Amino acid sequence: MIQQESRLRVADNSGARELLVIRVLGGSVRRFAGIGDIVVATVKEAIPGGNVKEGDIVKAVIVRAKKETRRPDGSYIAFDENAAVILKGDNEPRGTRIFGPVARELRDKRFMKIVSLAPEVI
């Protein structure tokens, strides 16, 4: 369950390491985000020479969440960390590599580029 002030690990090579969620997109009273949801965040930690700098405001999609997500077959999927991938304006990833596994739910939400770049889809 990702909400305002949640900290996320960045799962791509855009140059950011950690994000702080400012807003969950998808309605004026939406409080929580899950896998495949888009959030607005600020970069709290970044590596030198990266595409993004500390303090930048970015959009990101959640690719891993500690809170379990129920699937249509009745099974649940949960990860060890909360992680996101930073997006460009057209909902394409800003980085060129994705680190770690991503959830299959991203395919249903039309993030095909992220799914194709990921080393493992669970």
UniProtKB/Swiss-Prot annotation:
Keywords: Ribonucleoprotein, Ribosomal protein, RNA-binding, rRNA-binding. CDD domains: Ribosomal_uL14. Gene3D superfamilies: Ribosomal protein L14. Disulfide bonds: none annotated. Transmembrane segments: none annotated. SMART domains: Ribosomal_L14. GO terms for molecular function: large ribosomal subunit rRNA binding; structural constituent of ribosome. One of its GO terms (biological process) is translation. Coiled coil: none annotated. One of its GO terms (cellular component) is cytosolic large ribosomal subunit. Pfam families: Ribosomal_L14. Belongs to the universal ribosomal protein uL14 family. HAMAP family: Ribosomal_uL14. Part of the 50S ribosomal subunit. Forms a cluster with proteins L3 and L19. In the 70S ribosome, L14 and L19 interact and together make contacts with the 16S rRNA in bridges B5 and B8. Binds to 23S rRNA. Forms part of two intersubunit bridges in the 70S ribosome. This is Large ribosomal subunit protein uL14. It comes from Corynebacterium aurimucosum (strain ATCC 700975 / DSM 44827 / CIP 107346 / CN-1). The lineage of its organism: Bacteria, Bacillati, Actinomycetota, Actinomycetes, Mycobacteriales. The gene is rplN.
